[in-house]
Regions:
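Generic alpha-helical transmembrane segments
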Residues: 730-731, 776-777, 799-813
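Conserved cytosolic headpiece of P-type ATPases
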Residues: 1-750, 760-761, 774, 785, ...
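Membrane-water interface at loop-to-transmembrane-helix junctions
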Residues: 755-774, 794-800
Length: 897
């Protein structure tokens, strides 16, 4: 905690005001005062909640109504002494819990990553003396000595700075080094613009200084993020909610039927209680799709592997299906929608405006006048030659080609863009000698070099146009010098700003003969403007097509950037973002209440000058409108927004570890197109999950109906619990994997996102599973009725029924391949998974029917070959009936409109 908050933020106060408000001095605190404050405010450490132990998280996976049914069945089997059945049923419950536990994402890791960012020791000034203390002992009012390489131990107000530069990417995601000063700042500023504050967890890249501790522990920026991460409750995914509802529905239905049958059988059939309980256990086990949770987890895992091959790492399994329901993607601009390679697109001189071709650091692309596509040739002494020479030599960056043949720059992106520009056209050779340099500094916003160029001695200057305009008295033209025309240059800047270009000016001045030193005073008069360059971070070509795909798929793309609104709108229009004609700023968002924000979140697609806090509120606002939100981020302070989003998307290259831990998905290439590919894969996986659910449940319905009919008729129970578990775990699970490998259907990205509240078991799905379940049950019942009078043993009849149900399932799996179309399409041969699982199923059936130890364990008998033919024909007939049902349903839907 910190001392009482001042009326103005610390960054708006002078050093003396801050020291007074926090009751400290340049000599630091006394030992007694430090001890008192430590007792009052607590240790400088992030608060943490105790995590659940592993065994408790494992037991939580038994908290499911369907698992309750299995555990109750196992307990009854134990009481009745049926050990084999008990172990098999209990084993199924444990396997399901193990799979869920293994796949569970440990959310505590993201909080631990934040805590790991804190340093262990700090050098402080107390009573005028330097002391090294544990960072946990820091208190508000301590003076911390800062050196290059240090990790900042608390939030500090800079009171002394010597070329102090800090790497804040770990907090903000911005890769540029921030220069710090002790000067007071004015107005409300976002976190990244508070140049006199140092934040806990960031790193000093160069220079040094001193800082006054203004916040410790949970009151630091890092502490606020830690608290937000602890408080955020992750939304349960639509599928998780639906499967819970489905489980409860099945549970209640089973309970009602079992009670009704128990009463009916006792009154009208006079069955022994022990026999009745065994029959009802069989019914419970038959009606519960035991394998479904494991099947869903494994299909999602296969989706994770497929996405990893497409450069999207899924960290939390349910994310795979959530991607298919996503309605909005909020994406950062730099590096995700754009190339993160600043590129010059225009050069403006007093005589001519040039267009520059090329969209990357590769030094390829012509330069030509805007009204003439003919490439220019640079001649010695021309204005363009002098301009290109200036931006090349007044430049600290380097253009290099790496081992993979890719062009890269070292240094800042703006200087890098100018270096690439100069390399696009060969300049006439000239002997150049650097004599002196004034490095770029954010305080004066320009850079200057003193060169001898051949026989000429010149000062070269590059920097912000508004700064250089104040220094210039003349401008260079093809005909020599003429008075500086401010109106002309301001018009050009306004014109190209509308295209989203950032402007950099270049100028020169003759130097005195033999001059060896360069000072700021040398540049205060006599400077001649050469021109300005307009540059931008160009859109990724693949992002443009990916956004078009998303819009086609009914997904709105919203761009979030720290850029100026005009620049943001221009980039948005190039990308093809929906409503790119208007933008809203972070400051406007901050002034809105929750209702106004939810309306603005729906209305606007371009969000400029935004902060990570705006991102968090934006996610909440969109979710309040029932949107399923994907959010990208890279800095630590993006982590709460990512954790809150339905799909948090972290950048794999420039993202921090904390952000990656908080995210559901990590892009290994930081590319928006990868998100679009992941959406395609998510929809495919969801389709296959739905097909799998439609495939599994009819078998349970058929098994349950067979037992219900037998109880009502007072007949032999056709299937034992272990045979039912064999069907549900071995047969259903095996065949389900064939559907998991099914390719996406043709219209997968031409349909809108599914509604998150739309149940996987919609009206048509319920009709289908009931229809198929009844058909399988009736077929098996008729076959059983035909076999019983012929004197076959109970074991033989059960084996024939098992074979009938398994064969019917295999054919129905083929039906489920395609939702509406004919299932025996050419894609059937392309899906190798179906043929692999078919082979495995055949081997399993041969084993359970003919292997003596399996016959003993499961109570089966060997079948003559003719019964394989009979069951095959029954299955094929059902396949054709379901295909006919699909045709009729399709026609009915078409007629209905």
């Amino acid at each position: 905690m910190i001392t009482e908050k001042p009326h103005h933020p610390y960054y708006q106060q002078t050093v003396d005001e801050t020291l007074t408000n926090i009751q400290s001095s340049l000599d630091g605190l006394t030992s007694a005062e430090a001890t008192a404050r430590l007792e009052k405010y607590g240790e400088n450490a992030l608060p943490q909640k105790p995590g659940k132990p592993g065994w408790l998280r494992f037991l939580a996976h038994f908290n499911d109504v369907l698992i309750y049914v299995l555990l109750a069945a196992a307990l009854l089997k134990l009481i009745m002494g049926h050990w084999v059945d008990m172990f098999v049923i209990l084993g199924v419950a444990i396997i399901n819990a193990l799979i869920g536990h293994i796949q569970e994402s440990n959310a505590e890791k993201s909080l631990q990553s934040i805590r790991n960012m804190l340093s262990s020791e700090a050098v402080v000034i107390r009573q005028g003396n330097h002391e090294t203390i544990p960072t946990t002992a820091l208190v508000p009012g301590d003076i911390v000595v800062i050196r290059a390489g240090d990790r900042i131990p608390a939030d500090l107000r800079v009171i002394e700075a010597h070329n102090l530069r800090v790497e804040e990417a770990i907090l903000t995601g911005e890769s540029t080094v921030v220069e710090k000063s002790s000067d007071a700042l004015h107005g409300e500023l976002p976190l990244g613009d508070r140049y006199n504050l140092l934040y806990s967890g960031t790193t000093v890249s160069s220079g040094g200084g001193k800082g006054l501790v203004v916040a410790t522990g949970g009151e630091t920026e890092l502490g606020h993020i830690n608290q937000m991460m602890s408080d955020i409750e992750k939304h349960r995914t639509p599928l998780m909610v639906q499967m819970d509802k489905l489980g409860k529905t099945i549970f209640i239905t089973i309970l009602v039927i079992m009670l009704a049958l128990f009463v009916f059988s006792l009154i009208f059939r006079d069955m022994p209680v022990s026999e009745l309980v065994l029959s009802l256990i069989s019914l419970a086990v038959a009606a519960v799709p035991e394998g479904l949770p494991a099947i869903i987890s494994i299909i999602l895992s296969l989706g994770v592997q497929a996405m990893a091959r497409r450069k999207a790492i899924i960290r939390k399994l349910p994310t795979v299906e959530t991607l298919g329901a996503m309605t909005v993607i909020c994406s950062d601009k730099t590096g995700t929608l754009t190339m993160n390679e600043m590129t010059v697109k225009a050069v403006i001189t007093a005589d001519t405006t040039y267009r520059v071709e090329g969209d990357s650091y590769e030094p390829v692309g012509n330069i030509h006048p805007v009204d003439d596509p003919t490439p220019v040739t640079v001649t010695q002494g021309s204005v363009l030659e002098r301009y290109l020479r200036t931006v090349d030599l007044c430049n600290d960056s380097q253009l290099i080609k790496d081992e993979q043949g890719l062009w890269k720059i070292t240094g800042g992106p703006t200087e890098g863009a100018l270096k690439v520009l100069a390399a696009k056209i060969p300049l006439p050779a000239i002997d150049a000698e650097l004599r002196s340099k004034i490095p770029f500094d954010s305080q004066y916003k320009y850079m200057s070099t003193l060169y001898r160029l051949g026989d000429e001695e010149v000062m070269l200057i590059t920097g912000a146009p508004d700064v250089l305009f104040r220094l210039c008295q003349h401008q260079q033209t093809q005909n020599g010098l003429e008075p500086f025309n401010l109106h002309y240059w301001e018009e050009k800047i306004e014109e190209y700003a509308r295209e989203g270009l950032r402007m950099v000016a270049a100028a020169w001045k003759p130097a005195a003969s033999g001059q060896r030193e360069l000072t700021h005073a040398d540049l205060q008069e006599g400077v001649i403007l050469l021109g300005i360059a307009g540059m931008m971070d160009p859109p990724r070509p693949e992002a443009i097509s990916a956004i078009a795909d998303c819009l086609q798929a009914g997904i709105r793309v919203k761009m979030i950037t720290g850029d100026h609104p005009q620049t943001a709108m221009s980039i948005g229009q190039m990308l093809g973002i929906g409503n790119a004609a208007s933008a809203i700023t972070g400051r406007e968002l901050e002034a809105m209440d929750d209702h106004q924000l939810s309306e603005a979140a729906q209305k606007y697609d371009i969000f400029a000058r935004t902060s990570p806090e705006d991102k968090f509120r934006l996610v909440q606002a969109l979710q309040s409108k029932q949107e399923v939100v994907g959010m990208t981020g890279d800095g630590v302070n993006d982590a709460p927004a990512l954790k809150r989003a339905d799909v948090g998307i972290a950048m794999g290259i420039k993202g921090t570890e904390v952000t990656k831990e908080a995210a559901d998905m990590v892009l290994t290439d930081d590319n928006f197109a990868t998100i679009a590919r992941a959406v395609h894969e998510g929809r495919r996986v969801y389709d296959n999950l739905k097909k799998t659910i439609l495939f599994v449940i009819p078998s349970n319905i058929a098994q349950a109906l067979l037992i219900i009919i037998a109880l009502l008729a007072g007949n032999l129970i056709p299937l034992t619990p272990v045979l039912i578990l064999w069907m549900n775990m071995a047969t259903s699970a095996t065949l389900s994997f064939g559907l998991a490998f099914e390719a996406g259907e043709k219209d997968i990205m031409n349909r809108p996102p599914r509604k998150s509240n739309l149940h996987v078991m919609d009206g048509y799905a319920i009709w289908r599973v009931v229809f198929v379940g009844l058909m399988i049950a009736i077929s098996a019942f008729v076959l059983e009725a035909w076999l019983q009078p012929r004197g076959y043993s109970a074991e033989f009849i059960r084996t024939v029924l098992l074979q009938t149900l398994v064969t019917a399932q295999w054919f129905y799996m083929l039906n489920c391949r395609v939702t509406d179309g004919f299932s025996l399409s050419k894609g059937l041969l392309a899906n190798k998974g179906i043929w692999i699982v078919s082979g495995v199923l055949l081997a399993l059936q041969l084993l359970i029917v003919y292997a003596p130890f399996m016959q003993m364990l499961f109570g089966t008998e060997a079948l003559p070959f003719r019964y394989w033919i009979i069951t095959f024909l029954i299955g094929f007939a059902m396949f054709m009936i379901v295909e006919a049902e699909k045709v009729l349903t399709r026609r009915w839907r078409t007629t209905k409109g």
